[in-house]
From Swiss-Prot:
The keyword Acetylation does not apply. It is found in: Synapse, Synaptosome; Cell membrane. One of its GO terms (molecular function) is syntaxin-1 binding. Belongs to the SNAP-25 family. PANTHER family: SYNAPTOSOMAL ASSOCIATED PROTEIN, SYNAPTOSOMAL-ASSOCIATED PROTEIN 25. Pfam families: SNAP-25. The gene is snap25b. Gene3D superfamilies: 1.20.5.110. This is Synaptosomal-associated protein 25-B. One of its GO terms (biological process) is synaptic vesicle priming.
Amino acid sequence: MADEADMRNELTDMQARADQLGDESLESTRRMLQLVEESKDAGIRTLVMLDEQGEQLERIEEGMDQINKDMKEAEKNLTDLGNLCGLCPCPCNKLKGGGQSWGNNQDGVVSSQPARVVDEREQMAISGGFIRRVTNDARENEMDENLEQVGSIIGNLRHMALDMGNEIDTQNRQIDRIMDMADSNKTRIDEANQRATKMLGSG
């Protein structure tokens, strides 16, 4: 009788331990799901900020291109004014090469984001289930659902990371173009100011 009682106690302890492990496993999947959802929200916020930053860079580049066009017109007016006053044209004809318009330079600009591609492993995992069933109870059902959502969100996070990388590369190239345009515009403005100062001094 004592052996039978000991065995019942041992089975009860094992069942209690199994229940405890089941509860801990379920709580772990809940924490995992919460963490990946927070990561997804952070990724969405980052993509929104990158999109807003891209729009700002577009406006800056358009502004630089407008300055370039305005300087082309200003240089032409200075040349016409110099000729009208009978002055020798300054050796600023070299600036003619700087009169190009940059507005249509779209090198490296991504006009659309890459399409979403579902990984075969994700599809298999979703269709097959993520845990080996032991008790087949509600806890295991929830664990399986949680892990399915975790797998789906992780797949989305991978695609979001690719989108972020592409957008950052595009914006880095755009920033390089803007810096080149700013340097060119500054040089042309300085040289135009020198021409105007000379003409005023000669007058």
